[in-house]
Design a protein with these regions (language model features):
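Bacterial lipoprotein signal-peptidase II cleavage site
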Residues: 21-31
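Extended ligand-binding regions for polar small-molecule ligands
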Residues: 22, 76-85, 146, 162, ...
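Extracytoplasmic small-molecule ligand-binding "clamshell" domains
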Residues: 29-115, 125
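Flexible hinge/capping segments at coil-to-helix
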Residues: 34, 144-163
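Short helix-initiation/N-cap motifs at beta->coil->alpha
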Residues: 39, 92-103, 148-151, 187-201
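Periplasmic-binding protein-like
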Residues: 135-139, 222-263, 286-302
Length: 302
């Protein structure tokens, strides 16, 4: 029975992956590559009335809602509001693996990454980030009872038999490396759904992700899933500092005018009652507000 329930859960979680590889707010599939006009991406999008966003299948940031047949999530819904205020009424989603988001943006498969991507100095050298929309700590998804007693990245280091699951291209692999988790103890998955399945199957003893991601996954599993959130949990300490990640939108580096215009509208929205009400269904609270943290500060961090 547990196996049957597990399969049903994984099927429900992965419908976004099976339903379509692209989506728009008006249920139109995205086809081909973006082709900005000579006037720039922003002008082209305004003229067309629509724009493509790249996303990975990771709730609560960006995922396919199979019931509504559209991409949704905290990052996507904020983008819809901000872009509409900029005169762009339609959003077309392009689904890809997390590790392919930046290459896809650079290849002009889409014009914005809306996936809750953390702002890091390394990524700042590849893309232009907006200011963040949220800040959050880390968590582990483990088997019920947490048999390897993993409550931090450091616990993985201390136990050579422990395997830590991470999503390809996500920040968690970087955190693990910086706290000296051996590469041989890391198991790389293409997405959060696969990581959940990997923990259930014993391929990994813990899946490292944002606390919001783990909360969302646990909210979609039943008592028979055999999983739990590792509690308590201690965020990794890197270069003497506790880690708190900040997610934002990413633009091509030659789309600075677009990024600046987006940022201006974003600043008017983040922290408002409208913003809080919009993201509450995805598990976001005032605790996740980015406060005075900016992309410039995060990009300059050492």
């Amino acid at each position: 029975m547990i196996v049957q329930r597990t399969r049903a859960i994984l099927l429900a979680l992965s419908l976004g992956l099976l339903a379509a590889c692209s989506d728009s707010g008006s249920d139109k599939p995205a086809q081909g590559a973006s082709a900005p006009a000579a006037g720039g991406t922003l002008e082209a999008a305004k003229a067309a009335g629509k724009i493509r966003i790249g996303y990975a299948n990771e709730a609560p940031f960006a995922f396919m809602d199979s019931k509504e047949a559209k991409v949704t999530g905290e990052s996507v819904e904020i983008a819809r509001v901000v872009l509409k205020r900029m005169g762009i009424n339609e959003v077309e989603g392009v689904l890809t693996e997390f590790g392919s988001l930046i290459p896809g943006l650079q290849a002009k498969r889409f014009d914005i990454i809306a996936a809750g991507m953390y702002v890091t100095p390394e990524r700042c050298g590849q893309v232009a980030f907006s200011n963040p929309t949220y800040g959050v700590g880390q968590a582990f998804l483990v088997k019920q009872g947490n048999p390897k007693n993993l409550h931090s990245y450091e616990d993985v280091v201390k136990n050579p038999d422990a395997k830590l699951g991470v999503v390809v291209g996500a920040i968690e692999a970087e955190y693990a490396s910086k706290v000296k988790v051996p590469a041989g103890q890391m198991v790389v998955f293409p997405d959060a759904v696969s990581a959940l399945s990997g923990v259930q199957a014993g391929r990994a003893d813990a899946y490292a992700a944002t606390a919001l991601t783990v909360n969302d996954l646990m909210g979609k599993t039943d008592a028979g899933s055999g999983l739990e959130k590792a509690e308590p949990f201690t965020d990794p300490v890197i270069d003497g500092k506790g880690v708190r990640g900040y997610g934002a939108y990413a633009f091509r580096t030659d789309d600075k005018a677009f990024a600046d215009a987006f940022n201006a509208e974003l600043a008017k929205f983040i922290g408002t009652d409208e913003h809080k009400q919009l993201v509450a269904p995805f598990g976001f609270t005032p605790e996740e507000l980015p406060k005075d943290v900016t992309a410039a500060k995060l990009c300059a961090a050492k």
